[in-house]
Amino acid sequence: MNSARTAATAARVLRQLRHDLRSIALMLLVPVLMLTLLRFIFDGNPRTFDSIGASLLGIFPLITMFLVTSIATLRERTSGTLERLLAMPLGKGDLIAGYALAFGAVAVVQSLLATGLALWFLGLDVVGSPWLLLLVALLDALLGTALGLFVSAFAASEFQAVQFMPAVIFPQLLLCGLFAARNTMQPVLEGLSNVLPMSYAVDGMTQVLTHTDMTADFVRDAVIVAACALLVLALGAATLRRRTP
């Protein structure tokens, strides 16, 4: 990998995103609006908002980054941009790292907005450090970016990219512990939830919600989410295609 080529790719993607106001709105505003809506849904029960809102603070960025990244990457391939780039002395690793760096920068802004709004405007009450909450939200957004880059290799159209959401995101959403504690699930489902990265994203948020200090479980959860993001990025580089058949 070449750092200069990676940085150039990231800068190009960011320039394109600057002119795509709809994608920017989806990435930055949708998580904020969803958290605000959730706060007023549980207006009479702030404890419920605290428990669910902390988890969704990580889930919403993951979902939005997954959608935008998968569609944006596929659009580049169908338009022939990836084919032209890969015809140049630019490796697949440089390309994927550049995309990850660009969308990762957006993920930082997204996580700052969502976390700041939840804590200081919506009254989300967490026992632990706000910085740890921000860290998990950022890792979740980066995981969504990695998953989006990966699945874009298997889609032939933007519609197919969206269709991957029920296959990749919805099972994790159901089994992550948001709706029921994972240790109360049927053993097969609990075992399946143990290998899904979103489960550890929710667990990490729960650790911040209930513990004043950084715990060993929090470190484990954060490391697993980060490792999953790196693994999926590596798979994305391995499966990247020049063009859509």
Regions found by a protein language model. Give the residues of each.
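Transmembrane helix-boundary elements of multi-pass transport/secretion proteins
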Residues: 2-83, 92-112, 122-137, 160-163, ...
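Transmembrane alpha-helical segments of integral membrane proteins
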Residues: 115, 200-210
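Hydrophobic transmembrane alpha-helices
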Residues: 56-63, 104, 138-142, 167-175, ...
